[in-house]
């Protein structure tokens, strides 16, 4: 009896501890902006915008809102997602995910295509439907379901507009009505509607997705208004005295969700700055607790700011499967974290019988604003090391393969192996910055054998080198800020990609990669 009571006591202590742990932000590091979250039973699902990358709209699953695992992407077929001519400022903008009567809906905007659309599924781990195109314009659309009706909100004319739609056909069932334009900040966007205790709450973002970003909220007794703003707006921002010295900036574009225990939470985007105000990792996904004050308004993390270390009670925490440091290609398919520029040619990505990823060369380069043979992972840490062995085969003059530190078609650092007219191999480092293309260094390699390319980084520099027979050779370094959003533009973040390109359309070149390694600094995102 005494032992049984002791075990019960230990178990209760364990539960209390797990439900009172703090956590670290960002909860999803790297280029994962514009988060939207929904609850289905005791599971949570989250999506992010993806811009020019395919597949589109990464999809995550969690049990506790802190630990997330990417389980897929919502847009996995060319028929769902046309990214022709898309760049880091176009393609897929902010999505919203909602769950209603056993069906998951994801609504978003392809600003390079036909505009607003939604897809749906009964199993988020499976395929999603073909696009259902919508009539109301604007960006950052969201859905709200009530009493068998489906409402859509977006910002077609700079105001937040509401209409009723049929989510299965896309037909608009009511005229668009302006319901709020925020508190006067520029770019009223990212609207979401919730209902709590008889109030309809309209959450939006204002100020643009830079230093002046903020989250504001209004409410009404009726879904179509009139909406009254919270006297304490903004409810989240770092564009004030409380947040101006934080290493986290650009807080905004948020979504709310009620936990299984009745607690409330907000997911939002923000970015970690380097010295100054530059950021390279992109806008990331952050989590903050929410309480409701005596006047029934939400209060975010007590003072409307967030931090890297959050010492607050949480839901009982459950670890999720993380990305391995060494990624092999023996399964014959890419995990959902891998992305391509625009719509890839499937024939240029082959899995060999001996477990390698084979990339087939085309004349399309990383600077061509098209879809080169390129497959990448998001950089998630300031301090990291990435490497991959590359074997270049049947290469012609100036055919090359390697690793690119890629921000945009006009902004990338490339570490490559190539062959000259005498069939001699070399390894080189090239910088592409706007109109400037600079070959920093190129050195000869042994005639045969594997070359492992290595990219390291800290908050200030990328460091480039290679290994032959296990011996490391340095090639140079380059400042990180030239690949920052503030310098290169766009809405994405740095990705690290394997690529191959040819100097001739008749090239037969290909490159085999046995694995890709990525290791972040221990504790940076913990």
From Swiss-Prot:
GO MF annotation: an example: alpha-L-arabinofuranosidase activity
Site (Important for catalytic activity, responsible for pKa modulation of the active site Glu and correct orientation of both the proton donor and substrate): 140
One annotated Gene Ontology cellular component of this protein: periplasmic space
Domain of life where this protein originates: Bacteria
Cellular compartments annotated: Periplasm
Pfam families linked to this entry: GH43_C2, Glyco_hydro_43
Broad class of where this protein is predominantly found: periplasm
Description of pH dependence: Optimum pH is 6.0-7.0.
Transmembrane keyword on record: no
Cited SUPFAM superfamilies: Arabinanase/levansucrase/invertase (SSF75005), Concanavalin A-like lectins/glucanases (SSF49899)
GO biological process, one term: symbiotic process benefiting host
Active-site annotation: 34, 189
Catalytic activity: Hydrolysis of terminal non-reducing alpha-L-arabinofuranoside residues in alpha-L-arabinosides
Sorted UniProt keywords: Carbohydrate metabolism, Glycosidase, Hydrolase, Periplasm, Polysaccharide degradation, Signal
Pathway participation: Glucan metabolism; xyloglucan degradation
EC number assigned by the record: 3.2.1.55
Extent of the signal sequence: 1-20
Function: Alpha-L-arabinofuranosidase involved in xyloglucan degradation by mediating the cleavage of terminal non-reducing alpha-L-arabinofuranoside residues in xyloglucan branches, converting the 'S' units to 'X' units.
Any further remark recorded for this protein: Gut bacteria supply the human body with energy from dietary polysaccharides through glycosidases that are absent in the human genome. Xyloglucans are a ubiquitous family of highly branched plant cell wall polysaccharides present in the vegetables we consume. Enzymes involved in xyloglucan degradation mediate the conversion of otherwise indigestible plant polysaccharides to short-chain fatty acids.
Family: Belongs to the glycosyl hydrolase 43 family.
Descriptive protein name: Non-reducing end alpha-L-arabinofuranosidase BoGH43A
């Amino acid at each position: 009896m005494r032992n049984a009571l002791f075990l019960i006591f230990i178990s209760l202590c364990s539960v209390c501890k797990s439900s009172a742990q703090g956590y670290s932000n960002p909860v999803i590091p790297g280029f994962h902006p514009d988060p939207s979250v929904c609850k289905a039973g005791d599971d949570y699902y989250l999506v992010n915008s993806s811009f020019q990358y395919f597949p589109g709209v990464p999809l995550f699953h969690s049990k506790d809102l802190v630990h997330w695992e990417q389980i897929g992407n919502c847009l996995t077929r060319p028929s769902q997602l046309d990214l022709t001519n898309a760049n880091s400022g176009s393609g897929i903008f902010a999505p919203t995910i909602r769950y209603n009567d056993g069906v998951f809906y994801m609504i978003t905007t392809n600003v390079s295509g036909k505009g607003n659309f939604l897809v749906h599924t009964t199993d988020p781990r499976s395929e999603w439907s073909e696009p259902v195109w919508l009539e109301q314009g604007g960006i950052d659309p969201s859905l709200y379901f009530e009493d068998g009706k489906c409402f859509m909100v977006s910002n077609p004319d700079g105001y937040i507009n509401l209409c009723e739609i049929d989510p299965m056909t896309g037909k608009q069932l009511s005229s668009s009505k302006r319901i709020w334009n925020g508190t006067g900040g520029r770019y009223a966007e990212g609207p979401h509607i919730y209902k709590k205790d008889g109030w309809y709450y309209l959450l939006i973002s204002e100020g643009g997705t830079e230093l002046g970003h903020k989250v504001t909220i209004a409410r009404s007794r009726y879904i179509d208004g009139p909406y009254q703003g919270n006297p304490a707006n903004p409810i989240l921002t770092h564009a004030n005295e409380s947040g101006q010295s934080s290493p986290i900036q650009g807080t905004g574009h948020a979504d709310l969700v009620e936990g299984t225990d009745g607690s409330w939470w907000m997911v939002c985007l923000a970015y970690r700055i380097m010295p100054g105000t530059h950021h390279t990792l992109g806008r990331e996904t952050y989590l903050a607790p929410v309480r409701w004050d005596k006047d029934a308004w939400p209060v975010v993390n007590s003072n409307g700011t967030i931090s890297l270390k959050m010492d607050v009670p949480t839901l009982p925490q459950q670890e999720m499967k993380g990305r391995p440091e060494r990624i092999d290609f023996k399964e014959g398919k890419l995990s959902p974290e891998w992305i391509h520029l625009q719509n890839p040619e499937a024939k240029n990505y082959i899995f060999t019988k001996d477990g390698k990823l084979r990339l087939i060369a085309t004349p399309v380069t990383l600077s061509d604003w098209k879809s080169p043979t390129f497959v990448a992972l998001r950089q998630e840490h300031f301090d990291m090391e990435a490497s991959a062995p590359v074997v270049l085969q049947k290469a012609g003059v100036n055919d090359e393969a390697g690793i690119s530190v890629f921000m945009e078609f006009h902004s990338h650092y490339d570490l490559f192996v190539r062959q000259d007219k005498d069939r001699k191999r070399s390894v080189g480092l090239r910088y592409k910055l706007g109109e400037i293309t600079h070959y920093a260094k190129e050195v000869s390699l042994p005639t045969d054998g594997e070359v492992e390319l290595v990219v390291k980084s800290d908050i200030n520099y990328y460091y480039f080198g290679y290994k032959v027979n296990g011996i490391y050779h340095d090639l140079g370094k380059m400042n990180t800020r030239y690949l920052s959003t503030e310098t290169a533009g766009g809405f994405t973040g740095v990705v690290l990609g394997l690529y191959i390109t040819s100097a001739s359309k008749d090239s037969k070149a290909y490159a085999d990669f046995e694995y890709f390694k990525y290791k972040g600094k221990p504790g940076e995102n913990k």
